[in-house]
Amino acid sequence: MFLHFGVNTFTDREWGDGKESPDVFHPTDLDCRQWVRQARAAGFGMMILTAKHHDGFCLWPSRYTDHSVRSSKWQNGQGDVVRQFVDACREGQMPAAFYLSPWDRHEPSYGDSPRYNQHFVNQLTELLTTYGPFAEVWFDGACGEGPNGKRQEYDWPSYYGTIRKLEPTALIAICGPDVRWVGNESGVARPGESSVRDAGAHQGSEARGQVWYPAECDVSIRPGWFYHASQDDKVKSVEHLLDIYFKSVGRNSVLLLNVPPNRAGQISKFDVQRLTEFRAALDEIFKTDLCAGRPAHGSNIRGNDPRFAAANASARATSAPVTA
């Protein structure tokens, strides 16, 4: 489950400009445990919080910026959404992950590549060492102008190295070497989507061998990524969500469904209802295991060796979650 939450939730925008007052961030009844309960009930296998979006506002009291919960009046500047989020995830036995946007429309050093890259590594280190362990770090590739009108050259190898050093088991997703973006925000993979890709091909270099590089399909349950009250009646239908499911999970990809918390700091009742209906529909569709007790056959056997016959396969279906 993706959770887009931040100053945009309160300014009714999708992309903030970094000039918003930290005081606009003021959830009246933040309940991260409610997030986890709803995610577990719907069958999600991971939760990813937007710790910092393009506006640069941090949902933790970062010591590297003045644009964070520390500078807001919410909980007298003592609030920490990331802390409440990871604590709720651990209490509910839900893997926690975070989204961290390299684009920062507030940070003055953005566009001064070496200086900003160190700033970004500092914040990345702060999150990993203060709140870990994390299951995944999700990098957005957006690279617009900063407050000085300059663009930034991201030091991806440095970012990856920091994660590998501090959180070696965490996946690095989207702008990363472990999980790739499917290429759209509609939650739809290509027919025949393969997890085996040419090594280096995504970087524009000559392919040398092949690697395991699965696709992730991100999409929001609403038209927008952040919560907007005007979209309460525009939550995707069960039929639409099922179509997305079969065109993502059914095409060998991970489905990352965004469910944005509202201004109170909770998942909206409208979204909860749709998640409940979606889960019920999936349970009904898959209540009968069509493979149980069926014989296995293979038209091609490795080296024509009967030891590799399909009937000897040890793989089995599991009830593991297939969405994040």
Regions found by a protein language model. Give the residues of each.
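Mature catalytic domains of secreted/periplasmic carbohydrate-active enzymes
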Residues: 2-314, 318-321
